[in-house]
């Protein structure tokens, strides 16, 4: 039994899918996210691709904006999903993702938490196993038709304020870690071969 004031609705009533899609032709470099490059909201790599010198994958079509949820439609149990915070203007993701945009921005975090809970992943994985395809997969209608237990708007708003701060901090921490890792990888070989010492002024390297 659900609490008083709560409702059970289909997830698709609160969001739209794949709102922004490119024709695949770009006149500027892009940052491409493939399904294998994000796991449980952690991006391993964004591929920098320049159409003047690189082959742009045919699946590089989905455009994303702040707060969009990307959810791989292949093998949901592998957890290739995340919520996009502070995306670059030229970020493009694979058509292997369902890109989910909440109709009301406050819902994005609530919907994301619902989609990544164990019961939902298990449910979608079961659906994927029965798919008539070469590999376990789902489609957007499978996500749209999920039953979502929704609290009152006032509770959603309160939750969203806290969740937004947390996800922004997670994004900031991730970018700082990537920057520090890059600096380490650049400086360690120089330290090992004697080009710099632990007492050197490393500020020039930090600015790279």
Question: What are these regions, as identified by a protein language model?
Answer:
Residues 79, 109, 113, 122, ...:
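Feature representing long, continuous alpha-helical segments
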Residues 12-24, 33-68, 78, 93:
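Sequence-specific dsDNA recognition surfaces
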Residues 60-62, 66-121, 127-140:
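A short beta-sheet element
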